[in-house]
């Protein structure tokens, strides 16, 4: 119903708690912690299919919706697709499970293996 563009904020959680979905429209993004934060607050994720992060985090679109940034109408088509989804709650649970691989401890283990 309503979309608010509020710019940069230090505490995103107070906004996430009031939302239903999170849209990431970046042209380039590493595994964005903002997506992890959105998943932790049970938001459905709609993201551009930019290099690296979103595709990996959303399991190549199986746990959220990916759209192509450079194709006219893709974002609006993704929003329409979201409104027609039947298992949004199940999908949100699957997205939230992905957050477990992005803890500080997991990053430490990966870095430790790289430095061996």
Where in the sequence are the language-model features?
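Nucleotide-activated donor-binding/catalytic signature segment of Leloir-type glycosyltransferases, i.e.
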Residues: 1-7
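Aromatic "clamp/platform" in nucleotide-sugar-dependent glycosyltransferases that forms part
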Residues: 8, 27
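A short alpha->beta transition loop at the rim of the catalytic pocket in nucleotide-sugar-dependent
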Residues: 13, 20, 42
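Short glycine/serine-rich donor-binding loops of glycosyltransferases
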Residues: 32-35, 54
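Donor-sugar nucleotide-binding helix/loop cap in glycosyltransferases
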Residues: 38
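Short hydrophobic beta-strand element within catalytic cores of glycosyltransferases
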Residues: 44-48
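Conserved acidic donor-binding segment of nucleotide-sugar-dependent glycosyltransferases
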Residues: 60-72, 80-86
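A charged, aromatic-enriched C-terminal amphipathic alpha-helix characteristic of glycosyltransferases
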Residues: 66, 87-116
